[in-house]
Amino acid sequence: MSRILESMLDGVKSVAILGHIRPDGDCLGSTLGLYNYLGNKYPGIHARVYLEEAAEKFAYLKGFDEIRHEPDDRVYDLCVCLDSGDMGRLGKFSCYFERARDSICLDHHVTNTRYASANLVVADASSTCEVLYGQLDEAYIDRTVAECLYTGLIHDTGVFKYSCTSAKT
């Protein structure tokens, strides 16, 4: 799988990271996984995660306390939408998508409307975290990134029991 995300990050100075309304484990795992990964590999990129408030049971994820819950007037070079099948799922944070200079959506839902400038939709993936993992340079996946990605995997696979679980998962 080509690393479209990495190519879109070239020359970018700011990234808004969005997920869906009522964030679950895959949404939080993918958004915070990407946030922490960017901090590892691209320390010069200013990244922020924007999501509705999430359950405290996910507070163990690094970056959970840094999630922004209200929109502001910032404009970003790139908006990365994760686990969101259409713009409506971005809720009140769709303003970042609309104002961004470029956009990409990574998702695993077959119903994805491919609304971003670039879209990587892998319908047979177990989770968006699995899709995201395929886009990342393993050398920059530390424990915090891995914990985020694992959270998404176990959430969307029912701890590897659901039929969406595969050998690749």
Which residues does each predicted region cover?
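Active-site cofactor/cluster-binding pocket
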Residues: 62-118
